[in-house]
């Protein structure tokens, strides 16, 4: 299935806590706490968010998401991409100066996060000054709601700030689309096949703003869904549940 209204989903993993004996269908308190910490993202000791939170979506049960955040080690040895690729990236590319001997368990978000400030200008794409770009420019931004590396909430907050800073008319130049279930760029239990190139071409050359983009996917044969410009989401109207024509984009 799909979680279209992802911001309306307030799932609490605490509901999975074992009532008594640990079984394969419940989680211990320590596991629930770890899951909450993972989805909340890194924070300082006083609770200030550094990045995140991540949203709960259907794709988190897939191999892509698990491979990034949890891994598949049966011995306790770290083998997730966060613990391997992520550690190398942080140690050599993000920190100033580089720290090849970095122990991630000793990383202090109160003390050490500031060590990334020099590279942030090259890696952070969070500018909201887009009024000059909006003068005849067009941009489509899209993100999978099960993206194992990018937090959708951070992207939606950026877009909200873009609208606040530049005014509602900026939506005539920049639109954001979220794809339920899609992992990083593609994959996942999603309708992850769509043509953004045609959408941006039609917008630039013919003045046709992308009010909805039709998507399909190998994970759901015979199913199509509309991708809606944020903050709108696809809502069922009537008719065939497998057809995009049965859905409207609304808040």
Language model: regions and residue ranges:
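C-terminal His-loop and adjacent cap/lid subdomain of alpha/beta-hydrolase
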Residues: 1-251
